[in-house]
Amino acid sequence: MLKKKIIKTHANHTNDTGSTQVQVSLLSSRVAQLTKHLNNHKNDYSSQRGLKKLLGQRKRLLKYLFVKDPLGYNNLIIQLGIRPGKSLVN
């Protein structure tokens, strides 16, 4: 249900489920869930590893989006409240 809502808000067209914006939004949602989980379970190292993998994937997608569509990148990081990457800031 949450996934469909995220897809609907960030999709470019009605059947868009795989665009970069949608993928980053879904990863950001999962990152928020894992962060909340890790606040309660500090020693859950497998979840910490999973969180790091998700953050790396999101970082790669954001870098791709910055190269292909800088305006879309800026809009997305503002909507999601993500800080711009260090290597992407002039």
From Swiss-Prot:
Keywords linked to the UniProt accession: Chloroplast, Plastid, Ribonucleoprotein, Ribosomal protein
Localisation: Plastid, Chloroplast
Alphabetized PROSITE patterns for the sequence: RIBOSOMAL_S15
GO cellular component: chloroplast; ribonucleoprotein complex; ribosome
Pfam families the record matches: Ribosomal_S15 (PF00312)
Gene Ontology BP, a term: translation
Subunit structure: Part of the 30S ribosomal subunit.
Protein's recorded name: Small ribosomal subunit protein uS15c
Originating organism: Mesostigma viride
Gene from which this protein is expressed: rps15
